[in-house]
Amino acid sequence: MDRISSLSNDIISNIVSFLSAKDAAVASVLSKRWQNIYTIVPNLEFDNTLENQGSLTDFLNGLLALPASTRIKNVSIKRRGRDGPNRDADLNRFLCNVLKRGVLKLKLDIWVTLDGRYSLPVEVFTCKTLVELELGSILQIDLVPENALLPALKTLIIDAVQFSDQSGCAFQKLLSSCPVLVELRMLNVQWEHWQWSRRVSSPTLEKLTMNHRYHFGNTYYDMEGITFDTPSLTSLKYYDLPPKSYPTVNLDSLVEATISLTLPLHHAWTGKHARRGDTVPSVTNLIKGLRNVETLNLSSTDTVAAFYFSNEAIPVFENLHRLSIATEREFCWRTLPYLLKKSPNLESLVIGGPLHYNYQLGDGYESEEIYSEDDDEEESESDDDEPICECLSDYSFLESCLVKTVEISEYSGTKIELKHMKHFLEKLSCLELVKVFSHERDEEEHVQLRTNLLNLPRSSKCKTQFEFIPPRSSV
């Protein structure tokens, strides 16, 4: 008996996973026992950006040398640039072969040159075993066959893929061919270049991520509308430039949502602020569609502003327990009262940025230095010069809140921030915990920051936690 045959099946299988398809085919003649174990290949990967990878043609020949009974679990293909005159034909021959071998996960990262055209083989859309399919990037899908069916597919990822079916909606055909789809990730999309029905529809979908590729300074964006018909969706991460409207929004099962809208140039949230030729998108239906969420993250200040200008559409969030809002130091908090008044069961409020101040007061309130009582001796500020912005008025909207936890993600300990915290601690009668995240400083400043905050009056049950975050490396 040779030494390899004396190893356990698990060890041999692990060794096999590191071999190329061609080498494995040669090695499979070592013994009958090896051949039996090699009926399943855990991973098959090709990446022509790596040294000594060889050509796709060689890789294909190695695959064809495997016994027809060999099954392959995971396949990953990364192709950049040109790889021989028959690169597209070789790639499709390779895909047609592996898709007959019971593949569970297929990842394609294919760059298509601008002067070339490439079409995926029909077999990609009719594979009965695929559980996860990832398509990218700079890939164009012109046609999804009428007989498309991916009966086992649960996860679909499309990255920088463009759909442009002239005879119908290839994107919706693809979704309709996935009867048990659970998760859809749409990354680096550019709707404005798609030819589609502007509809995301799936009765089984539970997790959805949509991420628009945004170019800074982009002025051309004229999407008519996007419809969400996803009644089983529980998790939504939506990063986009807002279309003109959201005709239909069916998100009745939604539990958690992260919304990040970026308003392009020549767009305005309200006609009052629009200039001639500006587009005024309506997010009313999108806001109403979020009514059942338990966790809501408004992760851009443009999104927070959209809620303010559409405040009449804000529903009562009966199930909302955790709310996160993005802030900037000079960004007005006028949306916050509307959100808190419509969230009767809110328990956790996360301020995703610095605390807001009345920047129009100027000197003394822009300072990033930690407040010290000695500063008062050098100031002659009148009590009438309240640095709190009018958007928060007297903070009376906090008095009816049941919030138990407040998190501040960027706390500097300045005088204005202490005034903010004083209002939070006084008005939030149910407050039990304040979490403060601040950048690392020297020990003396740490002590000063802690002391200032801990000395503020509060309920006896309210505790304060501090976490000092190290600065990001510039490397």
From Swiss-Prot:
It comes from Arabidopsis thaliana. Pfam families: F-box, LRR_At5g56370. This is Putative F-box protein At3g58960. Coiled coil: none annotated. InterPro entries: F-box-like_dom_sf, F-box_dom, FBD, FBL60-like, LRR_dom_sf, LRR_FXL15/At3g58940/PEG3-like. It comes from the Eukaryota. Residues 1-49 form the F-box domain.
